[in-house]
């Protein structure tokens, strides 16, 4: 399929105020296109009628579905109904509404948690649905898998050019730094910052510190998404990863160095670790000519700067 040109296109970014959505807006600024956004107060994505009216009125040529209810292990464990229902209903409404309103192309943003807990590493796209999920985030994962299948179903039945991309663990400006709902990177940044400010002697972290993860800066992810919107039109979902992995304990040491916390790091092994290892294979995306640009330490420094400027006193 030929390249999808963005020149003169109207592109709706759903979830534009989130970490990824806001990064997508910045990436699209260099394209000759018109970006459409809608605040939550004006458009409730869980209301099908509102979504369809918005799409029929705005008539976007392309849609990037970056809106989602997200959170870490604690949030997923305590609010399973919210995580599965809200994500299912939002993605179904946006995908169905996009089809009904004649959207030319849709990019659905998933998550690496869709893969089995013990998938062979690095995880390739074909590992989907080959084994049981990680129990600590299965509710969110099931909703995201459904989003992939919705895109594939509309393509199969109607020929819709709907694609899906699965990024690895993301971090960056506008991340969620609330300890009750955050992922590991923003949680570590907040904990290290507060430990430094309070002059604490140690920093306590969930789990053993041994699991390894693949982390990607949000600006690199948004760059990949715009690249895929232009160059990818296949049925199968495609991974977006950094190409490297790091243990949680190594990550914690880098965060402490960036933040300036000089105390000890202790691990609370009574808390769950989650999946022991998760590294995405980005071989397909790299073969198309895309690569990430931001080192982990630089990305963490930018994330901490954003946290201090916008969140630290809240």
From Swiss-Prot:
Catalytic residues, chain numbering: 140 (proton donor/acceptor)
Gene Ontology terms describing biological process: 'de novo' GDP-L-fucose biosynthetic process
Pfam families, sorted: Epimerase
Residues the entry annotates as binding substrate: 191, 206, 213, 273
Pathway it works in: Nucleotide-sugar biosynthesis; GDP-L-fucose biosynthesis via de novo pathway; GDP-L-fucose from GDP-alpha-D-mannose: step 2/2
Binding site for NADP(+): 15-21, 109-112, 144, 167-170, 183
Role summary: Catalyzes the two-step NADP-dependent conversion of GDP-4-dehydro-6-deoxy-D-mannose to GDP-fucose, involving an epimerase and a reductase reaction.
PANTHER family: GDP-L-FUCOSE SYNTHASE (PTHR43238:SF1)
Protein name, as recorded: GDP-L-fucose synthase
Highest classification ranks of the organism: Bacteria, Pseudomonadati, Pseudomonadota, Alphaproteobacteria, Hyphomicrobiales
Gene transcribed to yield this protein: fcl
